[in-house]
């Protein structure tokens, strides 16, 4: 458990949307990410002390299709722009958690482009899970590969390849050293080989013992991922659902049951964890659109 997370009040921003970026990659670089600096007084007014930023790495479309792990998306600005934002946030006492998408990359990822060009002769063929030149795929590449949930624009990485692991760890080290980020939210954590998380945890602990690792987990036993050997925390989707549905149905047993099951003094199964509790995010509807009665908003935020 990282001590700072016990009192962390998070604000979540999806930068590509927040900054009004174009839908697709642009060659021209625009310093939109600096807009976050303007919001620092607003964050301080709400006593926010941790900012979770959705994808900032270079991508072709929505950010979860990474094309370069070591470069800020042109639509957001330059690495220097983002460093300026990070410095301002830290000066204001706000920690920074970035979205780390390590299960898959986009089709414009540099190593995958090399495979598309050189095919079997590419030195990066083993970087991608179950790459097979004996079959075609819906994109008509003349080969196939594993994806995230059947989306062929999201190419699954081979995290059992040491070269891939080293590349990712070195990329993470760059963001830790140059931008002093405080943690990572790990996308699609339930799809990732647990051995990678063990390596990641060891690497981060040695690099910065205060660095926080939080995984996106929707179903299952959270202890499977959040434990001393792997991640520090996971998303608490169980209580997220209970927070709004208990109010909508005027039946508070659901949230009471979840809280007691998770954190109750007599055997709460997650009582030793600090889970990432939330009322909405980029994958679900906004809370104000989910609750049936506007007056319940204040109650839900208070319970959070």
Whereabouts are the PLM-identified features?
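Substrate-binding/active-site clefts of carbohydrate-active enzymes
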Residues: 3-9, 14-49, 56-173, 178, ...
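Hydrophobic faces of well-ordered beta-strands that scaffold small-molecule active sites
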Residues: 9-12, 51-53, 96-98, 184, ...
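Active-site beta-loop-alpha junctions enriched in small/polar residues
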Residues: 16, 56, 101-103, 189-191, ...
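Short, glycine/acidic-rich beta->alpha junctions
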Residues: 35, 77-81, 192-196, 293-297
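Active-site-proximal helices and loops of the catalytic beta/alpha 8
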Residues: 92, 116, 177, 187-271
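Active-site groove signature of glycoside hydrolases
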Residues: 102-104, 153, 167-194, 272-281
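Active-site-proximal substrate-binding groove within the catalytic cores of carbohydrate-active enzymes
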Residues: 263-304
